[in-house]
A protein has these predicted regions:
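A solvent-exposed, charged loop/short amphipathic helix patch at secondary-structure junctions
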Residues: 11-34, 139
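Short beta-strand/loop segment that forms part of the nucleotide-sugar
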Residues: 53-63
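GT-A fold catalytic core of metal-dependent nucleotide-sugar glycosyltransferases
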Residues: 64-65, 100-143
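Short catalytic/ligand-binding loop motif for oxyanion handling, primarily in non-cytosolic enzymes
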Residues: 12-16, 64-69, 119-123, 128-131, ...
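Short, acidic, metal-binding catalytic loop of nucleotide-sugar glycosyltransferases
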Residues: 45-53
Length: 203
C-alpha cells in the first residue's frame, strides 16, 4: 500500500493565466503549459493497473485548476499553499513545488511522484517500486552538466549526498521521465539538513 502524488497545471485556466502574467510579466507560453488531456488517462491507468494504491493526491495552485470531470471522492486535492511556505507563493517553477511534495499532510512513507504525462500501461505490483523498504529507481548517470536542467540535477545530487552522509562522486544522477518512488522520511531528512538551500532555490 502506498500513495501517489501528481503535479498538474492547466494552462488554459483563466485564474491561473491571470496570476502567471501578473507575477512573471510575460505572456503564457501555450507550448509549455497547454493541457493535453493526459491526466484522465493517467488516473484510469492507476485505477486499472495499480490496485494497491491507497490515496491519489493532485497538487495544483488553485481550486480552479481541478478538472471539472475529476472525482473529488477519489482524488485528494492539495493546493500549493498547503505545502509551500507562504513567502514563496505564488510559484510557477516546478522546483519549489517538487521540493515540498513530501509535506503533504497524511502522506504515506512510500509514495510515487507522477507528472500527468506518465502512464502505467501494464499491470504493476508494489515490488516494482519498493523492495525491502528501499526505492527501486530509474536514473541516468552523468559526468557533464551540459544544460541548466542537468546543472540543477548535479547540484541536487551533491546536496542530497551531503545531507545523507554519502560519499561525493564525480558522477551525478538524473531521473528518467518515469514516476519516481520516494521515501517520505528520507525527503524529511534532506529537507531539514539543506533547508537553507531549499529556501534560496524557492525564492
Amino acid at each position: 500500500i502506498m500513495d501517489i502524488v501528481i503535479t498538474y497545471v492547466d494552462g488554459n485556466d483563466p485564474v491561473w493565466k491571470k496570476d502567471y502574467e501578473k507575477y512573471t510579466n510575460v505572456p503564457v507560453m501555450q507550448k509549455r503549459f497547454r493541457d493535453w488531456g493526459t491526466l484522465k488517462y493517467l488516473l484510469r491507468g492507476i485505477e486499472k493497473r495499480m490496485p494497491f494504491i491507497r490515496n491519489v493526491y493532485l497538487v495544483v495552485s488553485h481550486p480552479s485548476q481541478v478538472p471539472s470531470w475529476a472525482d473529488r471522492e477519489y482524488l485528494k486535492i492539495v493546493l500549493h499553499k498547503d505545502i509551500i511556505p507562504e513567502e514563496f507563493l505564488p510559484t510557477f517553477n516546478c522546483n519549489p513545488i517538487e521540493m515540498n511534495l513530501h509535506r503533504i499532510p497524511g502522506l504515506d512513507e512510500e509514495y510515487l511522484y507522477f507528472n500527468d504525462d506518465m502512464f502505467p500501461v501494464g499491470d504493476c505490483s508494489p515490488t516494482d517500486f519498493f523492495r525491502d523498504g528501499k526505492a527501486v529507481i530509474g536514473y541516468y548517470r552523468h559526468l557533464f552538466a551540459s544544460n541548466m536542467y542537468k546543472k540543477i540535477c548535479r547540484n541536487s545530487d551533491r546536496l542530497a549526498r551531503e545531507a545523507l552522509g554519502l560519499k561525493p562522486s564525480v558522477f551525478f544522477t538524473r531521473p528518467q521521465h518515469i514516476c519516481s518512488p520516494m521515501l517520505k522520511s528520507v525527503c524529511d531528512e534532506v529537507y531539514e539538513k539543506v533547508n537553507a538551500q531549499i529556501r534560496e532555490a524557492s525564492a
